[in-house]
């Protein structure tokens, strides 16, 4: 999925440079959605990873 976000961002840049506003807008919109999905997933992994790591090491 990250590969598609990068591809769509590149397509949006190329289409924007060539003036295809409809295609650039659509590709940029999808890239933004995928970016925020990955951002939320990253934060969740950080939070859950911290709690799982603390539980695995036990109390001090």
From Swiss-Prot:
UniProt KW keywords: Cell membrane, Membrane, Transmembrane, Transmembrane helix
Topology in the lipid bilayer: Multi-pass membrane protein
Subcellular location: Cell membrane
Transmembrane segments annotated in the record for this chain: 4-24, 33-53
Claim: GTP-binding is one of the keywords in the record: no
A matching Pfam family: DUF1328
GO cellular component terms, semicolon-separated: plasma membrane
HAMAP family: UPF0391 (MF_01361)
Family: Belongs to the UPF0391 family.
Protein name: UPF0391 membrane protein CCNA_00709
Biological source species: Caulobacter vibrioides (strain NA1000 / CB15N)
Taxonomy of the source species: Bacteria, Pseudomonadati, Pseudomonadota, Alphaproteobacteria, Caulobacterales
